[in-house]
Design a protein with these regions (language model features):
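Short helix-boundary/capping micro-motifs
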Residues: 17-32
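Alpha-helical residues within the helix-turn-helix
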Residues: 29-30, 47, 68
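A short LG(V/I)-centered, amphipathic sequence patch enriched
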Residues: 46-63
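A short, exposed helix-loop element centered on a Lys and neighboring polar residues
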Residues: 82-89
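Interdomain hinge and pocket-entrance segments immediately C-terminal to HTH DNA-binding domains
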Residues: 90-97
Length: 97
């Protein structure tokens, strides 16, 4: 797995928080990042994918059709990651003899 692959899940997480919380500033607060860093991560994701995911305006954020599809898929992937981590942690619980 390349370093780029590791970064993809982070980009996905940031993008999902922006959508769920309705904006870059709210996502930045939740993720303990600066709004600028969140905006740059989403812009980098869009550049890598070659498609705009979010139509930005001063008043509200609106997903493009591609952004909506990417969000739907992202939340399923992130849920799978969380489930895998939870299951691994349960299996790693120390047990007495």
């Amino acid at each position: 797995m390349s370093r780029q692959d590791v970064n993809r899940s982070g980009e996905m997480e940031v993008f999902a928080r922006v959508v769920e919380l309705g904006g870059f500033s709210a996502a930045a607060r939740a993720l303990r990042m600066s709004p600028s860093a969140v905006s740059k991560l989403v812009a980098r994701l869009e550049a890598r994918l070659g498609v705009r995911l979010i139509n930005r305006s001063t008043r509200k954020l609106q997903l493009t059709p591609e952004g909506s599809a990417y969000y739907d898929r992202s939340i399923r992937i992130l849920d799978d990651i969380n489930t895998a981590e939870r299951e691994a942690a349960i299996g790693a619980t120390p047990r007495g003899r």
